[in-house]
Structure formats: C-alpha cells, structure tokens
C-alpha cells in the first residue's frame, strides 16, 4: 500500500511494482502532487479528459506504472476507514506523512503489527521520525542542500547549484526499495516485520556524490571542500570541452595519460611525459590543451568519443534525452519500451533498471486519479477481515501496543531475529565506487562479503591514485584525490586508508589472489563453489580474459547469482566504453539537464550521481535474484547497466522527449513548475540557504515571514504560473531578505511557518548539526591502519535486527579465514600460497616497488 506522495516513496513503490508486486496507490484529494511536478504532455486526440493536467504530467506517468489508484482522505472518517481496510490486506506499507500522522489516527506501526506481525512499514520523510527537524518539510533541493555536497557543486564565484530534476529523491527511492525488500525478506524468514525510518537527509549524507569522502577529508585536516571555477587547474584534462557540434566530457587520471597521448598523437607532447616529475610541470596543462582543443573542434562529439574510447580514454559525448531515444546502443539493447496511456497515448519510456530474465514488466500505465476505486472497494468487501477493525483503534493504540508483549509471529518463527542475508556468502570483485557501495549494502543486511584483491594489479581510483601517491600531490588535489588521514602516504599502508575506499569498506573481508595464474584461477573457482553471489563492475571483457566468464561460473556453481555492473551493460556498441560515473551521466542524458541557466556546459563542475544510485540499485537486484533462486534452485546472471538504472532517475524527460521532441535546458536551482525555488546568499562568507515553495499556501506563508504580506495577492505572484513568469523579481526580493540573516535563521523561520527551506551545509555544518546528533547519525568506525573516525551510519534505521557495522577491511586481512576455513587448505598448502606470492598484505615489495 503506497501512501507516499511526491517522488522518493513512489519511486520505491515503482521498483517493487515493476518487478511484480501489486501496488495500490492511495492518493489524497486532488491527487499526488507529482501529478503537477514535471513536464506537461499533450493529450491524445481521442482523450475525453485531455485538458486535465493531472493526467498528463510526465513525472507522475514515470513514477507510477503498474499501480492502481484510489483516493482516500486520512483526515475524514470515511477516508480513514478505507485506508484502515487497505492496511489490513497489506504486506508492505510505504508512507510519507508528517511524522505522527498515522499514529494520531490509530494506524501507526505498533497498531498495525498487532493485527499483522509480518507487516513492513517504511516511513520516508525529509528528516526522519524523530529529532528537532522531524516536522520540517522537504524537497529535492532541500535534501541536496543539507545532505549532499551542494556547497561544493558549481562555480566558486556563483551560488551553489543542485543536480537536475528529481534525481536526489529518486536515489532515496533506490535506497528505500533496498531497505523494503530486505525487511520483507526478514519477515518471510522469521515472521517478524519491522518499521523502517528513512530520513532523506541522512540517506544523502551517507551516500551521495563523495559526501562521505569530504566528511573524512574535513576530519583529517583538509578543511572545507569548496566549489571550483574549473577543473583545468589540473595537469591532465578533466573537464567539459567543445567539439564541432556540441560538447564532450574528458576525464583523465595519471594511469590513463598514455591513452590520451595515443589519441592526440603529438610526438613533442609525448616527450614531455618522459620526465618522472611531469605531474608537477606547471606548463604542461596548457600545452595539452593547445593540442586537445583543435582536435576536438575539428570533429563531432560522437566521432571524438568513438576515437578516444577506441584507445580506452574516458571521453564521452554530452547527450540530451532527445539524442538517446534512437541511439544505436539503446536501440540495440531494446532498452526503451512503449506504454499506451488513455490520455497521453503511446509514448516511449525508460526500460528496466537491470536485466533479470523476465522479472521486469510494465503491465499497466500510470493510473488516472481514483481510476480503480470501484474494483478496489469490491475487493475489500469480498475480503474477510482477519482481526478487529484498526480504524476503531484510538490515538493511543501505538503507545499501548508498544508496552504490551510482542505478538506471536505466524510464519516460520525462529528463536531469534536475523538479518535477511545471514548465511549468504558474496564474492566482491568490485572497483571504484558503485560496486563497493552495492556490496556494502549487502554486508549491512547480513551477507558475508569476501573481497578478492589481486596484489599484482593495483586498482586506481579504488584504493587510491597509486599504492603510495606523493603527499605534495595530495595536498594539491585535496578531497578530489580521495583523501588520506593527515595526508600521510609516505609510511604505513595507504591502500587501506584512502577516504573513498574507506567510505564503502565496512563489513567486508579481503583475501589476495592472482587469478591470472592457473593456480589462482582454480582457487578462485573453488571459492565460487562455496559462495552464493558474485558482484563485479570491471570492464566487460575482464572476466572472460581471466577465464571466469558466466558460462564457467555457472558450470562450477549452478546456484551462483552473478551481478555484473558494467556502466553501459554487457552488450551494445558502448559496452566496452571506459570512464567514471560522471562520464556516463554525460553520455546518457543527466549532465545536459543540470547547471546554471545562463552558462554553457563548460561551466559544469564534475558530479557523480550514477555511483551511489547503482550501489543501492545493485543490492536490490541481488536480493531479487536470490528470491528467484529460492523458487527455482538455479542462479542467474544480472545485467546491471549502471547507466540504465540512472536514466530511470530522469525518466520524465525521456517521456517528454518522445512526445514533444523538446530538448530541456538547465534551469539552475529552479523547479520546472513550482516557484519560487532557489539558492540565496546569507550573512557570512560564502553562506547560502535554499527556499522551495510548492504551492500557494506556502507562498502566502513566506510572504508573512519576510514581512511583505501584500505580495501574496500581488498579481505578479498570486499564482504558481505568475510566480514562474516573474521568478527573477522573486529571486531579488528573497535575496535581499536572506542576505541579512544566517542560513539557520532562514531555515527555522521558514520551516516554522510551513515553508520548505534549508541551509546549504559544508562538512563542519554536518558534524555540528543538532538533528543528526540527536538521532545518533555519526558513529565511530575504522581499522588498525586508518584509526578511528566518525562515519555516517547506515542509510536507514529500522526496528528489525541490528544492521551490521563491521570494521573497514584491509588488504589480505582474511587470507587465513578464506583459504583455510572456507576452502579447507592445510597449513602446508597455505604456506605454498605465500611462497607463490598469492598471500600478502601489500601492493609493494620490501624495497617499495610494485610486486
């Protein structure tokens, strides 16, 4: 039962619905606000109610496939009775009411579980169920301002700028669907459901776009990560560049310099790299650009992408959703699917976030408002109530139930609660960020995670720039270099201490093995025989080159689930493309939608959204496959194309592109329909606050807050449409008011009046936040190498079994466990692996050179 509105909760409901769940969407009178939150589509010529904007909004059409709609008002007796009846039938409830609303009506979690001990309730709210900000309102920009690194996104001489559309809320939806599926699996295994408290603020602080790395960097003496005017201060090109017909994003790490040189084919430039100190050559950056610019502008973006990618250099075209609908790669993968809607008519939309046989299907389009009332009420009338009517419970039901003995479970009771993935062993061959984030989630949910690390092949950007990067280079790069404790890499084991690695490394064990050797390959396959899942996100050809492709894995262990998280999928023209998350965000439409509305794409700072979205999405995919294996007894290959999962976060733009052909331009911090929304200057140096008015009531309240009540009836601002048309005037009015106040003054004055607002947080603000402190958000974590520091805890809280919080793994820390306990090797055989060079805890020999 989906009682959630807007984006995050409905996105979680869509994930469950599209993979087979029956989802009933309970809408408030007038409908879910997302019916008015995105591009408005033209009506089908045959539509009788085509003038109704609520049925033609691309955002709602995207978020609500495979759902049925019924309208019920929880504030009326009849509506409350209908909702109570629906909750009687539910396995899972997704809700986003202001905390306390369900409890006030006798429909809180404790009341519901008295009637159904297995019920899972997910409360997805801006700030969680408890804490000083629990009653405060949210929006996509609110979540990013406080939880994401909005402070460091954009240009240093401009205001911070949010990501495009609703991608932050969609990523929260990815996290929520993972939590929901995990909780439901626990309920099936133990008979005990749980209540999930998911704070959008916390989910973002724990995951989005290098936020955890920046928080560690601040603790390690690195200061605040600020906005940068350009990435071109670096020696190697990592920025957006113009071509003959558009733009490309080029990302270059030191290990890829030879690839770049092969493409540019300039002997004089290549000779400059013969010096061991080329990274410190102040003039080299300008000389590279002098060769790069002419090469780019003499060709088109597609050709330059193909040429660079042929040499494995991470150059990708900047595409819009319009560019992609008929792109050869997505046509070849049959990614886009067509849905016929009674008002909008046939339209193409994004396809599955991952491929798992026939698990994903669009069975019906998004519903019309209250479309299924009669059939849903008929089903309720036919159902026999299992218990007394919850609607008759008084407002103290939750408190009374909380003090009473636990109800008896009704399915497969166990002696003690257990996490859903306890007893599941997962081989982790992941790199960089997306894959490690996926296995981190799975470890949190109870799985044993065994990293298989090759000590002879250092993974750049996974455990650092290099095994022992120069400390002066790290000082120059700051948090962008991945962050190290006190910038110390000259001693110790820096491959165990890099911030980006540490951020995703809890609950994992590491063994070392050179799979390139016959002995190493055989030992790896023996581990496969003893495991349930393999997760990897290397280049597509890697497993086959190692002789451990899917056919080999499946033959050795038919029950194995393999989740392969290639950025562009396992087949298609772009499947072999290399890059980081930002590379594929440009290629697949997201980057074209974000940025300042008055500047060209070369002003964009590099952002990474695809990685955290893939982490939560990949964990959901693995659990889906494990559930299928429980039914069939056979494992499956998951083709998790990170780009296709991410494209679902901007799905409304693909629907609009298909129906209208419109290429959407960046709109900065504004909202496509609501107004005003923006980021405004405050008292202090580089201090900012965001305000996001969603309706006329909030606008009227804001007018009173700023002491200009007469503006509420001013014809220029009285309606949403008028405010959009006069947004520049509103921005000036609000900036004049905010500039005399601190960000927190703006935050509290607006929120206490019912107006969504937030300070734009830097790292120091996050650690000083009283709400996060009250909810125990930061917890101590570490290892012998990294020491003990404060890390964000899990992405959600729940009343189920305690999520795991194990130490950060170190290279080879579980060698004895894996080879002796899991594989059963004798002491003599283990010693032989040491002598053969498989077993180690370092990427370097004693003299400091690589193995």
Task: Tell where the protein language model's regions lie, with residue ranges.
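N-terminal helix-loop segment corresponding to the beta1-alpha1 unit
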Residues: 1-189, 368, 372-631, 810, ...
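Short, well-structured beta-strand/strand-turn elements
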Residues: 22-23, 309-323, 383-385, 449, ...
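Short Gly/Pro-enriched turn/cap motifs at secondary-structure boundaries
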Residues: 51-52, 60, 226-233, 238-239, ...
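Mid-domain beta-loop-alpha active-site segment that forms a flexible
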Residues: 142, 164-181, 200-211, 252-259, ...
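Oxidoreductase and adenylate-handling cofactor-binding alpha/beta cores
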Residues: 147, 173-194, 206, 210-219, ...
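Conserved Rossmann-fold dehydrogenase catalytic segment
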Residues: 157-167, 188-204, 228-231, 570, ...
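Aromatic-enriched alpha-helical interface/lid elements that frame and gate functional surfaces
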Residues: 237-311, 315, 322, 328, ...
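A glycine-rich dinucleotide-binding beta-alpha-beta segment and adjacent secondary-structure elements
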Residues: 311-363, 752-805
């Amino acid at each position: 039962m989906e009682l959630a509105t807007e984006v995050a909760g409905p996105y979680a409901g869509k994930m469950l619905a599209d993979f087979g769940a029956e989802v009933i969407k309970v809408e408030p009178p007038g409908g879910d606000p997302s019916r008015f939150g995105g591009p408005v589509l033209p009506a089908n010529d045959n539509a009788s109610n085509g003038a109704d904007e609520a049925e033609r909004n691309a955002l709602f059409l995207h978020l609500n496939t495979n759902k049925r709609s019924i309208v019920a008002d929880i504030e009326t007796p009849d509506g409350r009775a209908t909702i109570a009846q629906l909750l009687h039938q539910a396995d899972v409830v997704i809700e986003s009411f202001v905390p306390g609303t369900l409890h006030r009506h006798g429909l809180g979690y404790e009341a519901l579980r008295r009637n159904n001990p297995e019920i899972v309730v997910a409360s997805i709210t801006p700030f969680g169920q408890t804490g000083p900000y629990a009653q405060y309102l949210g929006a996509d920009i609110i979540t990013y301002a406080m939880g994401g690194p909005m402070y460091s996104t954009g240009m240093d001489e401009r205001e911070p700028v949010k990501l495009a559309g609703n991608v932050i809320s969609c990523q929260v939806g990815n996290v929520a669907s993972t939590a929901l599926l995990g909780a439901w699996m626990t309920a099936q295994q133990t008979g005990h459901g749980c209540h999930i408290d998911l704070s959008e603020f916390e989910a973002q602080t724990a995951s989005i776009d290098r936020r955890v790395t920046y928080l560690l960097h601040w603790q390690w003496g690195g200061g605040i990560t600020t906005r940068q005017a350009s990435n071109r201060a670096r020696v190697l090109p990592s920025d957006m560049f113009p071509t003959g017909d558009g733009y490309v994003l080029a990302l270059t790490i030191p290990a890829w310099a030879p690839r770049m040189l092969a493409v540019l084919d300039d002997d004089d430039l290549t000779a400059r790299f013969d010096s061991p100190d080329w990274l410190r050559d102040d003039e080299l950056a300008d000389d590279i650009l002098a060769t790069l610019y002419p090469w780019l502008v003499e060709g088109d973006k597609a050709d330059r992408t193909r040429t660079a990618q042929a040499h494995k250099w991470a150059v990708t075209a900047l595409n819009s959703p319009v560019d992609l609908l008929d792109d050869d790669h997505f046509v070849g993968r049959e990614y886009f699917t067509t849905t016929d809607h009674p008002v909008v008519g046939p339209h193409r939309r994004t396809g599955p976030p991952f491929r798992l046989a026939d698990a994903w299907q669009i069975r019906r389009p998004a519903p019309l408002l209250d479309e299924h009332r009669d059939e849903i009420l008929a089903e309720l009338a036919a159902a026999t109530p299992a218990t007394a009517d919850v609607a008759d419970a008084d407002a103290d039901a939750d408190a009374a139930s909380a003090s009473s003995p636990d109800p008896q479970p009704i399915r497969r009771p166990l002696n003690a609660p257990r996490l859903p993935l306890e007893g599941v062993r997962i081989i982790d061959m992941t790199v960089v960020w997306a894959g490690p984030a996926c296995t981190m989630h799975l470890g949190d949910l109870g799985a044993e995670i065994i990293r298989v690390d090759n000590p002879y092949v250092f993974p750049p950007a996974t455990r650092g720039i290099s095994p022992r990067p120069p400390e002066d280079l790290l000082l120059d790069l700051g948090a962008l270099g991945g962050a190290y404790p006190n910038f110390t890499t000259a001693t110790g084991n820096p491959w165990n201490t890099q911030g980006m690695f540490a951020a995703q490394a809890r609950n994992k064990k590491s063994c070392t093995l050179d799979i390139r050797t016959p002995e190493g390959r055989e030992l790896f396959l023996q581990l496969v025989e003893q495991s349930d899942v393999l997760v990897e996100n290397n280049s597509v050809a890697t497993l086959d080159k190692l002789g451990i492709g899917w056919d080999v894995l499946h033959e050795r262990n038919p029950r194995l689930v393999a989740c392969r998280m290639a950025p562009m999928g396992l087949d298609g023209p772009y499947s072999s493309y290399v890059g980081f998350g930002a590379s594929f965000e440009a290629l697949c439409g997201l980057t074209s939608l974000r940025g300042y509305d008055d500047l060209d794409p070369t002003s964009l700072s590099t952002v990474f959204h695809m990685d955290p979205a893939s982490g939560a999405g990949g964990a959901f995919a693995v659990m889906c496959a494990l559930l299928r294996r429980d039914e069939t007894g056979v494992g499956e290959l998951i083709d998790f194309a990170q780009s296709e999962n991410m494209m679902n976060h901007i799905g409304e733009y693909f629907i609009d592109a298909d129906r209208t052909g419109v290429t959407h331009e960046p709109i900065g911090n504004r909202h496509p329909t609501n107004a005003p929304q923006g980021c405004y200057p405050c008292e202090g140096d580089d201090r900012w606050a965001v305000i996001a008015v969603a309706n006329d009531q909030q606008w009227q309240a804001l007018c009173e807050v700023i002491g200009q009540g007469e503006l509420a009836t001013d014809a220029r601002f009285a309606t949403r449409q008028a405010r959009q048309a006069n947004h520049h005037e509103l921005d000036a009015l609000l900036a004049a008011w905010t500039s005399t106040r601190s960000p927190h003054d703006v935050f509290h004055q607006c929120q206490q009046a019912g107006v969504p607002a937030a300070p734009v947080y830097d790292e120091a603000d996050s650690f000083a936040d009283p709400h996060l402190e009250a909810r125990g958000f930061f917890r101590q974590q570490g290892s012998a190498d990294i020491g003990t520091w404060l890390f964000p805890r899990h992405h959600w809280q729940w009343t189920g079994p305690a999520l795991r919080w194990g130490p950060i793994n170190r290279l080879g820390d579980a060698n004895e466990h894996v080879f002796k306990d899991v594989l059963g090797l004798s002491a003599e055989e283990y010693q032989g692996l040491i002598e053969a060079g498989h077993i180690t805890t370092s990427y370097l020999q004693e003299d400091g050179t690589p193995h």
